[in-house]
Amino acid sequence: MSAQLKILAINGSERDGNTADVLRHAARVAENRGVDFEAVDLRSIRMERCGPCGDCNDRPVACTLADGVPEVVAKMVAADGIIFAAPVHGFGTASLMQTFIERAGVGYLRFDRPLSNKVAGIISVARRYSAGEVWAQLTVNALLNRMILVGSGFPATVHALHRGDALKDEEGLTNVSRLVERMTDMIELLDEHRRLTGRSDVLASNEVNERVGLALNELQAQP
């Protein structure tokens, strides 16, 4: 019997508010399908901003800043699916999530793309404006990491202002439920493929990452 499948949610909100409520809703949907669901609240993680070293495009190894980001990255690598959830602040992605995708992406994930072929889901929470823009940014980040995005109909954008408003957005929560259901379907399909074929290299690539071969790149292939 295979191990229990897991979805990890990254909560990019600075407070225990509407985004957290939406993820609790998502957790119930996943758990009803027998999937383990864990939410990581970035507000509880010690996370430094990028430092002044400026060597991100030259270093061939992981970032040396000592904080909680590597632990979260390890959880992501161990999960079968990952949900990126963030509220809209100032017409853009909340600063905690923005800092995390910069630190995790440039500092750890770009070297060998360890999130390749994991199933991704995107949720944005907004009063009214820029929900689509934040959803799109997080979607591009998932695609950059070679993750699998499963279409779920309307994007999982939830509208809310005051605490508790997210749970009143019936259409938004329906879209979140559909997202989690479809993610679970794909995770189960990939798990079945691995068990039946004995292969773990679903959608294998012969590139370490897309940076190889670029001019002025620290990972440029040697002749």
UniProtKB/Swiss-Prot annotation:
Superkingdom: Bacteria
Recorded catalytic activity of this chain's protein: (2S)-2-amino-4-deoxychorismate + FMN = 3-(1-carboxyvinyloxy)anthranilate + FMNH2
Free-text cofactor note: Binds 1 [4Fe-4S] cluster.
Keywords associated with the record: 4Fe-4S, Antibiotic biosynthesis, Flavoprotein, FMN, Iron, Iron-sulfur, Metal-binding, Oxidoreductase
One of the GO biological process terms: antibiotic biosynthetic process
GO molecular function term, any single one: 4 iron, 4 sulfur cluster binding
Record: residues binding [4Fe-4S] cluster: C50, C53, C56, C63
Cofactor(s) named in the record: [4Fe-4S] cluster
UniProt-listed Enzyme Commission number(s): 1.3.8.16
Residues that span the membrane, as ranges: none
Alphabetical list of InterPro entries matching this protein: Flavoprotein-like_sf (IPR029039), FMN_Rdtase-like_dom (IPR005025), ISF_SsuE-like (IPR051796)
Annotated signal peptide: none
PANTHER family, alphabetized: NAD(P)H-DEPENDENT FMN-CONTAINING OXIDOREDUCTASE YWQN-RELATED
UniProt family annotation: Belongs to the SsuE family.
Summary of the function given for this chain in its UniProt record: Converts 2-amino-4-deoxychorismate (ADIC) to 3-O-enolpyruvoylanthranilic acid (OPA).
Name of this protein: 2-amino-4-deoxychorismate dehydrogenase
Source organism per UniProt: Streptomyces globisporus
This protein's encoding gene: sgcG
